[in-house]
Amino acid sequence: MSLGILGKKLGMSQLFDDQGRAVPVTLIEAGPCRITQLKSADTDGYAAVQIGFQLIREKLINKPSKGHLAKSGNDLLRHLREYRVENSSEFELGASITVDDFEKGQKVDVSGDTMGRGFAGYQKRHGFSRGPMSHGSKNHRLPGSIGAGTTPGRVYPGKRMAGRMGGKKVTTRALEILKIDTNHNLLVVKGSVPGKPGSLLNIRPAKRVGVSIQQGGE
């Protein structure tokens, strides 16, 4: 299945494998999502499927979005995402996308917004080494030189300096699904994913899952 699913990060936990080793996992409440729009190459120039996630009260949604969802006969949904497909006619408008569409052991790419850290300094943002902390030192957490005077006489673009940290879209690739709970719409994936508990996640089948290398002769 080429479609992804939207979900909410619940937090992290751990599972134990057959050897008794603790494996860090992330719990994701994924779906159910509804197909809200089908796009085709004839009408839109490309084939895609749009899905919606998370019910929302009528007072919290604008009229254009309300009318868009009414065309597909869906309830009011907060989040909409679109996925490119080869043939959108294979899907049905209003159909549900659930965790049943994924398999245990499948690799997925998970996208989300990282936790915002606000305005951060050189050590926290870039991992710079600090200066001496002893008495008499005037350089504790300063960045050091940011450029020469006469030549070039300016700060080069891209120079790592203090500034806003976090709050960016990040994708963690090829995470393995270790467990699926269909009763509670849960995906349990190995490792960590971007964002804090409660943040929106986009889970898609992995684009790159690695290449197996044949050992020995043919």
From Swiss-Prot:
Cysteines joined through disulfide linkages: none
An example of a Gene Ontology cellular component annotation for this protein is: cytosolic large ribosomal subunit
Return the annotated region ranges for Disordered.
Answer: 127-167
Keywords, comma-separated and alphabetical: Ribonucleoprotein, Ribosomal protein, RNA-binding, rRNA-binding
GO biological process, any: translation
Q: What GO molecular function annotations does the UniProt record carry, in alphabetical order?
A: rRNA binding; structural constituent of ribosome
The record's annotation in InterPro entries points to:
Ribosomal_uL3, Ribosomal_uL3_bac/org-type, Ribosomal_uL3_CS, Transl_B-barrel_sf
**Pfam families cross-referenced by the UniProt entry:** Ribosomal_L3
Q: Report whether Magnesium shows up as a keyword of the record.
A: no
- PANTHER family (UniProt xref): 50S RIBOSOMAL PROTEIN L3, LARGE RIBOSOMAL SUBUNIT PROTEIN UL3C
Family recorded in the similarity comment: Belongs to the universal ribosomal protein uL3 family.
Self-association state and partner proteins as the record states = Part of the 50S ribosomal subunit. Forms a cluster with proteins L14 and L19.
Role description: One of the primary rRNA binding proteins, it binds directly near the 3'-end of the 23S rRNA, where it nucleates assembly of the 50S subunit.
Q: What is this protein called?
A: Large ribosomal subunit protein uL3
Q: Which organism is it from?
A: Prochlorococcus marinus (strain NATL1A)
